[in-house]
Amino acid sequence: MDKTYTIAIDAMGGDNAPEEIVKGALLARDKYKNLHLNLYGDKGKILELIGETKQDRIKIINTTEMIEMGEEPVKAVRKKKDSSMVVATNAVKGGSADALFSAGNTGALLASGIFIVGRISGIERPGLLTVLPSVDDPKRQWVFMDVGANAEVKPSYLYQFAVLGNFYATHVLKKPNPEVKLLNNGTEEDKGDKIHIQAYQLLKNGKQLNFTGNIESRELLNGHADVVVADGFSGNAALKAIEGTALTMFAGLRKILVNGSLKTKIGAALVKPALKEFSSVLDYNNAGGAVIAGVKAPVVKTHGSAKAKTVSNTIGQIKIMLESNLVPDITKYVDENKDQFKIILEEK
């Protein structure tokens, strides 16, 4: 019999909460038979949504507060002790849940993950990790970290992001020897500012890392790396540029095809299946969420606008993280390589 896991779900976090969160949780419950899902939030509203559905492997924990999307993160976490997010996070810390899911305030979830669940000993700064597709081969997914948690970094942070991303690629994406690259403004070894030049040397000499150099943002979707390491500012800017370009491109193309000549419309009908397939490659609803990597348990954030399908997919992502022993293996590796994790290149 498969080992069972309990996932704490912030049912009140997100633009479409609690409706889509509860629907997604029920989809995941039916799909993944070894998961128990604890929903934290307004019990009355959650019960209304569940209706006559059996509550098998579903538990509802009532909370009286919620953290809004626009609230100041750290202040909200400190003040709203009975919010769905904070109570769910404390359940993970206390051991009554194995992992945490939320579609709520990203900053608040970061604060909850870092200050309540806690950093893995030896990891200086946890970061946000996401998985993106390669356009030439949608099945070849790649890890991108950091995408927004740490705008300012040290070389050692970037090195640790590479280690965390490498573990995610091997454990969750099942890549045997992930190719690691550093996001930079050129491919040459001496490109970038002092931090990136020093980080390059750390990565180049890193133990058990298949580091193959720098990568420019224009190459991110071309399948040239399995793990891309970035500071949070550059990573977030690149991620939003990718998302924005995809949305703009498809909106512009749709406008041209709809308002074009008869020949254009006939052509549009012919290419529609191919365009639909390509758009699904870049559709975040088909993916999971962003992982707060470097904390003591899986903490995963999906888009605030997530629908039930995305919620279910993200819970499936957490399931793989738990079953692959991702966090315990990272913890063990960092503990066994403490000296390596203290390395910071001297300023030249």
From Swiss-Prot:
Pfam families: FA_synthesis. Transmembrane segments: none annotated. This is Phosphate acyltransferase. Its EC number is 2.3.1.274. Keywords: Cytoplasm, Lipid biosynthesis, Lipid metabolism, Phospholipid biosynthesis, Phospholipid metabolism, Transferase. It is found in: Cytoplasm. Pathway: Lipid metabolism; phospholipid metabolism. Catalyzes the reversible formation of acyl-phosphate (acyl-PO(4)) from acyl-[acyl-carrier-protein] (acyl-ACP). This enzyme utilizes acyl-ACP as fatty acyl donor, but not acyl-CoA. The gene is plsX. GO terms for cellular component: cytoplasm. Gene3D superfamilies: Isopropylmalate Dehydrogenase (3.40.718.10). GO terms for molecular function: phosphate:acyl-[acyl carrier protein] acyltransferase activity. It catalyses: a fatty acyl-[ACP] + phosphate = an acyl phosphate + holo-[ACP]. PANTHER family: FATTY ACID/PHOSPHOLIPID SYNTHESIS PROTEIN PLSX, PHOSPHATE ACYLTRANSFERASE. Homodimer. Probably interacts with PlsY. Disulfide bonds: none annotated. The keyword Disulfide bond does not apply.
